């Protein structure tokens, strides 16, 4: 193996300046989700919409009502209890954290 070629100080300085350091990673800013402006008071328009649309849903839960109808979670829970007592929807699974319903069929 041939010996390494000796570089002068000027050549070493030029080589050091040419390479440069790797730049630091730029952390991207997280996109912030806007605060939801859901309804918290049940007016007649919302009630009519709930009574009209919810019986057509195959899967009904609090989160489904919040997403589709733009209502608050507490209002969605009240609406689900009302629809269950009316016989419009029937429970599939109920426990303290999540209640899942489906539409009630006419044969039942």
From Swiss-Prot:
It comes from the Eukaryota. Disulfide bonds: none annotated. Transmembrane segments: none annotated. The keyword 4Fe-4S does not apply. The keyword Ribosomal protein applies. Residues 1-36 are annotated as: Disordered. Residues 1-20 have a biased composition (Low complexity). Pfam families: Ribosomal_S25. One of its GO terms (molecular function) is structural constituent of ribosome. GO terms for cellular component: cytosolic small ribosomal subunit. Residues 21-35 have a biased composition (Basic residues). Keywords: Ribonucleoprotein, Ribosomal protein. PANTHER family: 40S RIBOSOMAL PROTEIN S25. Belongs to the eukaryotic ribosomal protein eS25 family. This is Small ribosomal subunit protein eS25. It comes from Eremothecium gossypii (strain ATCC 10895 / CBS 109.51 / FGSC 9923 / NRRL Y-1056).
């Amino acid at each position: 193996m041939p010996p390494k070629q000796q570089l002068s100080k000027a050549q070493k300085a030029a080589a050091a300046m040419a390479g440069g350091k790797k730049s630091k990673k730029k952390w991207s800013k997280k996109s912030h989700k806007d605060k939801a402006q859901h309804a918290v008071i049940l007016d007649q328009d919302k009630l009519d919409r709930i009574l009209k649309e919810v019986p057509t849903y195959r899967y009904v839960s609090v989160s489904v009502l919040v997403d589709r109808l733009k209502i608050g979670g507490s209002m969605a829970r009240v609406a689900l209890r009302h629809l269950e007592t009316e016989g419009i929807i029937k429970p599939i699974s109920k426990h303290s954290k999540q209640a899942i319903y489906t539409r009630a069929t006419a044969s039942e």
